[in-house]
């Protein structure tokens, strides 16, 4: 890679070091400064003329500073007559804001794509985009790599009874991700769904009205009850982030209805269904005193549950799901696995203290403080630098990268 160079932003120096070592090249000498007024200054101290430049900058806890720094580096390389500029973004910032979830929302991920293009980027390499459709936001080539081969290899090597495990999606939006991993490992999969706030008054009125309906309606309710009693469907209530005892037998559709769904007019009123972002937002935004429902579709009894999501950001949904899997569904243990470990605030501490979670597994796409790793004995970090380094090498040499979608590095 004589005509190539790699430049690292300030977001993830450890990953830069790992990738550079694998490629056998020394990172380009750059000066990253911040003025007293908060502005970012970038100085590239080596020539990049006619070079194939790869800029490594991931999302970080200072996401806006990291993004602005990346844009300035791209612009500086463009002004320095670089032959081609590739932004290597293991975790793409603002990827969760890739659609309008409410009226008058901004599609921020598309704006970030436009900013990168205007700055002068020629190519983007990223890993496990939150929504693969985001590739359509760009007018430049995008290579969306997968962490799945590395995660699958880790499972084979480190989970003793992985052949009997079940891959579980934390929400319906992650079904495609989970089924893909399940197919790779030849395992069964299961799905978890959480509904919105239940209204006891609404449910009681609904049940009272059921009693006055015709025999046909009563038959429908009975069938619903039988369906919910099947072994592969496990429903429970949770409150204050924990599963609660429910002595009341679920016998009516009101158990999975809510006043919110009945009265709220939203973006899904004309069809479609909420995504995993909406599920997460529902859990975090509802009143902490609101009783809610969680349902598992699948069988994890006596098995290891591999609870999968692309990002681990808020602990509440993982804790509730893990407690439900162990207490109500009979799972032997729960291993939480995600590509991007965005452990903000007390997230990692809360996951560590959860008795139902045995292990937390992430890749090093997102910078994690070394002290946090030392303090959390449940945390395992998979090195993903091999995938990124091989993608950089193949891109520079004009080779196909489809090989990376199936093989671990």
Curated annotation (Swiss-Prot):
* GO terms under biological process: 5-phosphoribose 1-diphosphate biosynthetic process; purine nucleotide biosynthetic process; ribonucleoside monophosphate biosynthetic process
What SMART domains would the database entry show? Pribosyltran_N (SM01400)
Q: Give the enzyme's EC designation.
A: 2.7.6.1
Q: Does the keyword Kinase apply?
A: yes
Q: What class of enzyme is it?
A: transferase
Cellular component, GO annotation: cytoplasm; cytosol; nucleus; ribose phosphate diphosphokinase complex
Keywords (A to Z) from UniProt: ATP-binding, Cytoplasm, Kinase, Magnesium, Metal-binding, Nucleotide biosynthesis, Nucleotide-binding, Phosphoprotein, Transferase
Q: In which pathway does it act?
A: Metabolic intermediate biosynthesis; 5-phospho-alpha-D-ribose 1-diphosphate biosynthesis; 5-phospho-alpha-D-ribose 1-diphosphate from D-ribose 5-phosphate (route I): step 1/1
Where is the protein localized? Answer: Cytoplasm
Disulphide linkage map: none
Q: What is the documented function of this protein?
A: 5-phosphoribose 1-diphosphate synthase involved in nucleotide, histidine, and tryptophan biosynthesis. Active in heteromultimeric complexes with other 5-phosphoribose 1-diphosphate synthases.
Q: What is this protein called?
A: Ribose-phosphate pyrophosphokinase 1
Organism this protein belongs to: Schizosaccharomyces pombe (strain 972 / ATCC 24843) (Fission yeast)
């Amino acid at each position: 890679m004589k005509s190539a160079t790699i430049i690292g932003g300030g977001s993830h120096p450890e990953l830069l070091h790992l990738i550079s070592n694998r490629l056998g090249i020394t990172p380009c000498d750059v000066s990253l400064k911040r003025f007293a007024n908060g502005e970012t200054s970038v100085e590239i101290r080596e020539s990049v003329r006619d070079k194939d430049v790869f800029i490594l900058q991931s999302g970080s806890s200072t996401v806006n500073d990291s993004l602005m720094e990346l844009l300035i580096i791209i612009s500086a390389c463009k002004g320095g007559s670089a032959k081609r500029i590739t932004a290597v973004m293991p975790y793409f910032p603002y990827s969760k804001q890739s659609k309008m979830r409410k009226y008058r929302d901004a599609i921020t991920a598309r704006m970030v794509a436009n900013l990168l293009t205007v700055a002068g980027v020629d190519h983007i390499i990223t890993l496990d985009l939150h929504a693969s459709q985001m590739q359509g936001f760009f007018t430049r080539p995008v290579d969306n790599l997968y962490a799945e081969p590395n995660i699958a290899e880790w499972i084979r090597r480190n989970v003793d009874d992985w052949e009997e495990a079940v891959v579980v999606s934390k929400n319906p939006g992650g079904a495609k991700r989970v089924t893909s991993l399940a197919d790779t490992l030849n395992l069964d999969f299961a799905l978890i769904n959480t509904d919105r706030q239940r209204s006891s008054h609404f449910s009681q009125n609904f049940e009272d009205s059921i009693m006055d309906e015709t025999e046909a309606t009563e038959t429908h309710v009975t069938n619903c009850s039988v369906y919910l009693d099947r072994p592969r469907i496990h429903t429970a209530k949770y409150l204050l982030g924990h599963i609660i005892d429910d002595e009341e037998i679920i016998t009516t559709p009101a158990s999975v209805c809510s006043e919110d769904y009945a009265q709220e007019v939203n973006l899904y009123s004309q069809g479609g269904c909420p995504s995993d972002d909406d599920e997460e937002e529902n859990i975090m935004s509802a009143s902490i005193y609101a009783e809610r429902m969680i349902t598992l579709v699948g069988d994890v009894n006596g098995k290891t549950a591999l609870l999968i999501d692309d990002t681990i950001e808020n602990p509440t949904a993982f804790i509730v799901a893990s407690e439900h899997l162990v207490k109500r569904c009979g799972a032997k243990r729960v291993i939480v696995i995600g590509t991007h470990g965005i452990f903000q605030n007390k997230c990692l501490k809360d996951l560590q203290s959860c008795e139902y979670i045995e292990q937390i597994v992430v890749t090093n796409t997102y910078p994690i403080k070394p002290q946090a790793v030392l303090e959390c004995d449940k945390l395992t970090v998979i090195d993903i630098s091999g995938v990124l380094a091989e993608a950089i090498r193949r891109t520079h040499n004009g080779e196909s990268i489809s090989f990376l979608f199936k093989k671990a590095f």
